[in-house]
Amino acid sequence: MIEELRFPLWASPKYDGIRGLVDLRHRLLSRKLKPIPAHVLQKRFSISLFAGIEGELIYGDPVAPDVMQMTTSAVMSVDKDDLASAVKLYVFDCFTEHRLPYWGRYQRLSRLAEKARRAGIILVEQTEIRTIDDLRDYEERIVNRGFEGVMLRDPEAPYKFGRSTLREQYLLKWKRFEDGEAVILGVEEGQRNENEQQLDERGYSKRSKKSEGMVPNGTLGHLIVRDRKNFSGLDQFHIGSGPGLTHELRAELWRDRATLKGQLVKYRFQRIGVK
């Protein structure tokens, strides 16, 4: 893909939240054009000044390990006002100005964001990218800051809802890791290592992983899953790590393990050797 890009492009961090846009009836809607449940957010953003803006609803720090879980809880609940009050809308487009090229729409957003910062409107910063080397350098900086990837835009592009094709290059996603979706087949309990602690040849402490010293710990260890599209080529595999899998969540999932089979779970992987 990278060899097919047409420069210059504008690049911004890929935010991992919930899509939010304000329609012409001044309602805050999701990507599926359904009203956002959080009453606090509807009250704050559902005004005529914001009609047409589109962005990503984010709770707290945009690069926090649990940003997606916390954002979902705050945005998709009707009764979590304290959480919802900490949500901001990171805006990147405006569909009411669809006849303008993207740079023109962005100028309009910039003026709006200056007026509306106290309401929780934040303009997503765009950086001009002129070469492949520029893109690689930018991606490295963004990933090191904790973002999962980069969004690329043609500054001359018209408005389009959703992502465009590689041929159009209006809006493209560029990230090192991809998201997959898998069906949960089963679960495995986590273990606590109670083998005797020893020192290795460098003087560092270590514990062996002898089975007799591995004790069940009452939390989720791994999900046994099968990918819906079989990206891995495996009949089944394990998912057991990730920034959102806190100790508390593992304990909750283990308590509810009887309900997990057949549910869908998202996971992140790096595709290797596939164009």
What is each PLM-predicted segment?
Residues I18-D23, R27-G55, L166-K275:
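Classical nucleotidyltransferase
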Residues L83-A84, V143-N144, P216-N217:
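Extracellular/periplasmic catalytic domains that process cell-envelope and extracellular macromolecules
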Residues K115, L123-E128, I132-D133, L152-R153:
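HHCC-type zinc-binding knuckle of retroelement integrases
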